[in-house]
């Protein structure tokens, strides 16, 4: 199984594509498709049918679409840069992610 260095609720920056440079929070990681849903990034218009049972009106709705995981990088809170994530073990044996630019622990 592949190891994903991006997790839900991470702050990420888009590094390529039409939304290059935008920063957002990861809403969902789609592991089977190698994609992530990022808040307010790669937004498309979708036509929604009205659902009277759930009191949902119909119309055109903006919806976030998945973006490939290779097109985003994790933002480090300490150095405020888009960075590659590495893994290491702490003294007590716990595996943690760290920023490869400033060596600060991310989570």
Swiss-Prot record:
GO terms for cellular component: ribonucleoprotein complex; ribosome. GO terms for molecular function: rRNA binding; structural constituent of ribosome. GO terms for biological process: translation. SMART domains: KOW. It holds the Pfam family KOW. Transmembrane segments: none annotated. It comes from the Bacteria. Keywords: Ribonucleoprotein, Ribosomal protein, RNA-binding, rRNA-binding. Belongs to the universal ribosomal protein uL24 family. One of two assembly initiator proteins, it binds directly to the 5'-end of the 23S rRNA, where it nucleates assembly of the 50S subunit. Part of the 50S ribosomal subunit. This is Large ribosomal subunit protein uL24.
């Amino acid at each position: 199984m592949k190891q994903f260095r991006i997790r839900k609720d991470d702050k990420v920056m888009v590094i390529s594509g039409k939304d290059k440079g935008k920063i957002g929070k990861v809403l969902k990681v789609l592991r089977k498709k190698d994609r992530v849903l990022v808040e307010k990034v790669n937004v498309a218009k979708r036509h929604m049918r009205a659902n009277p049972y759930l009191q949902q009106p119909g119309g055109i709705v903006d919806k976030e679409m998945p973006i490939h995981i290779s097109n985003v990088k994790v933002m480090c809170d300490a150095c405020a840069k888009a960075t590659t994530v590495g893994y290491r073990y702490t003294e007590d044996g716990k595996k943690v992610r760290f920023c490869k630019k400033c060596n600060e622990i991310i989570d």
